[in-house]
Regions:
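Elongated, mostly alpha-helical coiled-coil "stalk/stator" tethers of large membrane protein machines
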Residues: 1-211, 215-234
């Protein structure tokens, strides 16, 4: 229901703008939520939405982002599955299939058809929570690429589980021992539990490239070669 509410707000700029307007009293914004969503949604959902719109938001887009985050967190809390890993695997499937990425990212495509396609691809291969999150997000990209949507969802899920996400790019898969050592090192460095997601990219040649949020640690051979070429050219 939270995903549905976010979609409805995204489709109605006048409504989302009014709900994000800090000049309007919080009680007024809360009443709008009750009037619009109260008749069709569960009291718990309406309560979460009411609380959300009473906060200060810089824009309607930020409000919708906030409601989407609530939806992802709610799906995560309700599931015992490894939603984070399942979303990551789906993001790699999208990255490896340009036609799929184009179909899901097309502005001309029908939103519900995109959701149905994702549900069809994931049902039986992933948990209900993952199907819900992925199929819901692709229906309202709001100028974001599919992989951006999934990456953000992965970070939210990891945060809800008390972890940070490290995306490791390597020329070959890490052994269990290497992954364990890297996880331990990163956990100590960042002071939090780390979840590793590995991307295989032969172009890095050797070494690793690690990204945690906006922080990038590039220890790849390709990066060192690029630095060397730049120095030689200079």
């Amino acid at each position: 229901e939270l995903f549905i509410a976010a979609r409805e707000l995204g489709q109605t700029s006048q409504l989302s703008g009014a709900l994000a307007d800090s000049a309007a009293a919080p009680a007024v914004r809360a009443k709008v939520i009750t009037d619009v969503f109260g008749p069709s949604m569960a009291p718990a959902t309406v309560g979460l939405l009411t609380n959300a719109v009473q906060q200060r938001w810089s824009s309607a887009s930020d409000l919708i982002d906030g409601i989407e985050e609530l939806a992802v967190r709610a799906a995560t809390i309700a599931s015992d599955a490894d939603v984070e890993s399942e979303l990551f695997e789906f993001s790699r499937t999208v990255a490896a299939n340009p036609e799929l990425e184009l179909a899901l990212g097309s502005r001309l495509g029908d939103a519900s058809a995109k959701g149905d396609l994702v549900a069809k691809l994931l049902t039986g291969r992933a948990s209900e929570a993952t199907v819900l999150v992925a199929s819901s997000l692709v229906q309202q990209p709001r100028e974001r690429r599919v992989r951006q949507l999934l990456s953000r969802a992965i970070r939210i899920v990891a945060d809800e589980r008390g972890r940070a996400v490290a995306t490791v790019t390597a020329a070959a898969a890490l052994s269990a021992e290497q992954a364990s050592r890297l996880t331990e090192l990163l956990s100590r460095r960042y002071g939090t539990k780390i979840s590793l997601n590995t991307v295989i990219d032969p172009t890095v040649v050797g070494g690793l490239r690690v990204q945690i949020a906006d922080d990038v640690i590039d220890m790849s051979v390709s990066s060192r070669l690029a630095d060397l070429r730049q120095r030689l050219a200079g």
